[in-house]
Amino acid sequence: MSVLVIDVGTSGLRASVVRDTGAIEHLQYEAFAPQSPAPGLVEFDAQLMRDAVLRVSAAALQAAGSVSAVGITNQRASTIMWDKATGIPCGPALGWQDLRTVMECIMARSEHNMSLAPNQTATKASWMLKNYSHNANVCFGTVDTWVAYVLSNGDLHVTDHSNAAVTGLYDPNSHKWSSRALDIMGVDIAMMPNVVPSSGVIGAASALPGAPPIAALVGDQQGSLIGQGCITAGKTKITFGTGGMLDTFTGPTAPTSANRLAGGTFPIVAYSDAHGIHWGNEAIMLSAGTNIDWLCADMQLIDSPEHSHEVASQVETTDGVVYVPALLGLGTPKWDYGARGTLLGITRGTSRAHIVRAVLEGIAHRGADMVDASQADSGLTIESIRVDG
């Protein structure tokens, strides 16, 4: 048995064939970075994403010959609105890091007691309806929805529970879209995808040779959580990618609300299948690897991300230099959208190595913040952490 796995991340997408032995073969990758036309804005062209998904998938399939099924994992909450009749997006997709809806989140809290973050789908969908030219025949989706739509030649308009639960539009008690949240955001439920289990055949990838069945949809962080073997209460992983996500498996008991909790974390669906829904808790760092990219591409203090370790190891401490990794604001626990990256404690004796080490330590300190917040909100003790990226 072999599965074509399509992974659409924030900075690139890949397709590979995974054998039943766990071996990963025929990896195909394309960089696919979002654009930032102004500070705080993060967007991408969904049609270019469609083309790239089809290219890497076809290349991996050609190398493998055939596969038994297709699985999709994706950056979550990034939002696409398109015309149902034509399949053409109504405008740029809004990336999960986009901050243009900060004021809408503040208003939702003050007027409706809804604790939303701009990195969720809810206010992005509302903003698109107000700002993009469209007719009544439009639909929304996150990246998993879009990829399934593309692979099925438009037959599927679906999302899974793990993606739905981080949109800000999902009711964890009814396991359906929240009519109250949709009404507040001005989104018609007919525009939303059907919510399906993370595991189970949902349709055919008819755009690919052989039309293999699509048998899994799962958000990238939840896929990582399960892949790291975190399937008992308290088991935790942290992923350092473009951003940083700490996820803790909590079990089968649904949270009372999908809103942000007191410590700044969010309830998530870890995964769902025919036997039910399993839950987790997530803490969010809005920028992690982005800070390393900044050191490399913009400040030119290092040659590559890998080079950061070599440079930072040239000194034993930061010599008092402190870095706050807030290039896109601060997430858990404070959720300060106006915060910005800050470098403190610089003296005439500060070297390149001190700054690079301070940036790496700043990311690590934010990781510690997320551990504390997750323990406080989940009531679980995190005894160990599994790390990927």
What is each residue range found by the language model?
Residues S66, D188-M191, A364, T381:
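Short loop/turn motifs at secondary-structure junctions
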Residues T73-S78, S198-G200, F240-G243, S384-G389:
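Glycine-rich beta-strand-to-loop/alpha-helix junction loops that act as flexible
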Residues M1-G91, N137, N194, G210-A216, ...:
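N-terminal glycine/serine-rich phosphate-binding loop of ATP-dependent small-molecule kinases
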Residues L4-V5, V102-H157, G168-I184, S206-D388:
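Active-site core segments that coordinate phosphate-bearing ligands/cofactors
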Residues D98:
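Carbohydrate-associated surface elements
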Residues G12, R76, M192, F266, ...:
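Short glycine-rich loop/turn motifs
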Residues L182-G200:
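A conserved helix-loop-beta module that forms one wall/lid of the active-site cleft
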Residues L61-G95, A117-N119, A148-D171, V196-P197, ...:
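Short beta-strand-loop/turn "lid" adjacent to the catalytic site in phosphate-handling enzymes
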